[in-house]
Amino acid sequence: MPSSVVCDAGGVLAIAGVLEGTVPVDAEFLALDWSTMTIGRFVAARHEGSPERIHVEIGLALSVVHEWFPVRTLVTETLSRAGQGAVDALDSWSALILAETLDLPLFTASDEVSSDRIEIRRPW
């Protein structure tokens, strides 16, 4: 059985090959539904003016996730831990909290999150 890894949007994009880097192999990838919007925003900015490419790349990115979790149960803790200045990193903070809750590693492309409870893996 493969090991499980929680991913934020950057982790999902790296696994899908949209971002460069080394990715976990033989793993089950878990993510929050919240990450879908962050992934969409990134891909739309990357392929502005090309809806077909946006559609395909979002589909490819989302297909690497094996299980999606709802973010609603983590909103309060995310906002509390992330602070007011973490607007662009809220997805990463939510994923970190999910990873800590499940006692699994986090795969992220963010430098803004850290934990003394779980392993954090990055694509670089």
Short names for language-model regions:
Residues 1-35, 46-55:
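Short, well-structured N-terminal submotif of metal-dependent ribonuclease cores
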Residues 2, 32, 96-124:
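Acidic, PIN/NYN-like endoribonuclease modules and their adjacent C-terminal/linker elements
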Residues 5, 27-30, 63-64, 68, ...:
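Short loop->beta-strand "edge-of-pocket" segments that line small-molecule binding or catalytic clefts
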Residues 11-12, 35, 74, 94-95, ...:
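Alpha-helix capping/helix-boundary segments
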Residues 14-16, 42, 116-117:
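Residues that scaffold the ATP/ADP-binding catalytic core of kinase and kinase-like folds
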Residues 39, 60-62:
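His/Asp/Glu-enriched, well-ordered alpha-helical/loop segment
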Residues 41-45, 100:
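Short glycine/serine- and small hydrophobic-enriched flexible loop segments
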Residues 67-109:
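Active-site neighborhoods of divalent-metal-dependent phosphate/nucleic-acid chemistry enzymes
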